[in-house]
């Protein structure tokens, strides 16, 4: 029985030691730091306890050490928009059908033709813009340096491309005039465009009577009523430029430079329209029809 305390000490000694050590750790609550530097004059003694260092953020002291597993915050972090969680991802908005269809069908130079010789140069460019609301606009630009008559018009696909019958009978055409005309009304129906081409010197529409004289052939009655267009804007500028004559460089000749712009607003419904261009000068004839694909948006131009 005298050996009982020794046996109890051997049995419960390690357990008591662990309890004492754990009690010290719990009592301290955080690690202690000792100042091993030499004591300074008027300072504290060696072995003085230093203050607890602050955290890296400089706000709060370092939290007490714990062997317990940290709380599971993955659920809170996984929720978009939660505190400390990832930002809410933005959903990509699909462009509306109206905004997507508002893109222009053609651009400047998407259909054009160019003629360049020693005697003259001719360039016609155009574009078609769909306004989605059932209307579309047709725009033209024209530059020429020749004494001749140019006509650009909207025609149905059935329009024949030929030299014969292009110029209607009427007053003698002025060689220096050019026009951007709309073809789509019979002569007896009157001008459909509602305005006179003051800068062009004649009425647009019908037979284009006036100083211009010449015009394109007029389609049939059914085709003529299929077009519903009117002129929104038109302008023509002319200038003379002097240059040495080709036949005699010692003499000075002049060339007539013409710049024309026109915009037509047309209403549907019709699926295909064509652009008819005719140019007539003293020594050159040109007739061309371009029918852009209205339902195909292409980045490549239509060359004439």
From Swiss-Prot:
Q: Which residues form the signal peptide?
A: 1-23
Positions of the region II?
24-84
Q: As annotated in Swiss-Prot or TrEMBL, what is the tissue specificity of this protein?
A: Brain and kidney.
Q: Which residues are glycosylated?
A: 72, 133, 143, 149
Task: Report residue spans for region: V (Cys-rich).
Answer: 221-304
Keywords from UniProt, A to Z, are: Glycoprotein, Secreted, Signal
Post-translational modification summary for this protein = May be proteolytically processed in neuron-like cells.
Region (IV (linker domain)), start-end ranges: 164-220
Q: Please tell me whether the keyword Glycoprotein is annotated for this protein.
A: yes
Q: A Pfam family this protein belongs to?
A: Neurexophilin
Q: Name the domain of life this protein comes from.
A: Eukaryota
Q: Name one GO cellular component term.
A: GABA-ergic synapse
Signal found in the keyword field? yes
Q: What is its main location?
A: secreted
Name its cellular compartments.
Secreted
Name a GO molecular-function annotation.
signaling receptor binding
Q: What does this protein do?
A: May be signaling molecules that resemble neuropeptides and that act by binding to alpha-neurexins and possibly other receptors.
Would you identify the family this protein belongs to, as annotated? Belongs to the neurexophilin family.
Record's protein name: Neurexophilin-4
Organism, per UniProt? Rattus norvegicus
What's the gene? Nxph4
């Amino acid at each position: 029985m005298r050996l009982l305390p020794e046996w109890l000490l051997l049995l419960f000694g390690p357990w008591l030691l662990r309890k004492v050590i754990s009690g010290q750790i719990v009592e301290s609550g955080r690690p202690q730091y000792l100042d091993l530097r030499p004591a300074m004059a008027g300072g504290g003694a060696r072995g003085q306890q230093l203050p607890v260092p602050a955290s890296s953020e400089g706000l709060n002291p370092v939290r007490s050490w714990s062997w317990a597993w940290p709380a599971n915050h993955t659920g809170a972090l996984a929720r978009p928009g939660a505190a400390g969680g990832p930002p809410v991802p933005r959903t990509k908005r699909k462009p509306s059908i109206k905004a997507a269809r508002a893109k222009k069908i053609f651009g400047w130079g998407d259909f054009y033709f160019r003629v360049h010789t020693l005697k003259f140069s001719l360039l016609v460019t155009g574009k078609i813009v769909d306004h989605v609301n059932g209307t579309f606009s047709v725009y033209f630009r024209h530059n020429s340096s020749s004494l001749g008559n140019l006509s650009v018009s909207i025609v149905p696909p059935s329009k024949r491309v030929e030299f014969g019958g292009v110029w209607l009978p009427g007053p003698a055409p002025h060689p220096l005039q050019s026009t951007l005309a709309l073809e789509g009304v019979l002569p007896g129906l009157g001008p459909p465009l509602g305005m006179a081409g003051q800068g062009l010197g004649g009425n647009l529409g019908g037979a284009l009577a006036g100083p211009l004289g010449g015009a394109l052939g007029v389609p049939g009655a059914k085709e003529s009523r299929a077009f519903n267009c009117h002129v929104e804007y038109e302008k023509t500028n002319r200038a003379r430029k002097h240059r040495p004559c080709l036949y005699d460089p010692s003499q000075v000749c002049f060339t007539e430079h013409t710049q024309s712009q026109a915009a037509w607003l047309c209403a549907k419904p019709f699926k295909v329209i064509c652009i008819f261009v005719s140019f007539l000068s003293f020594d050159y004839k040109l007739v061309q029809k371009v029918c852009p694909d209205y339902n195909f948006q292409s980045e490549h131009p239509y060359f004439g």
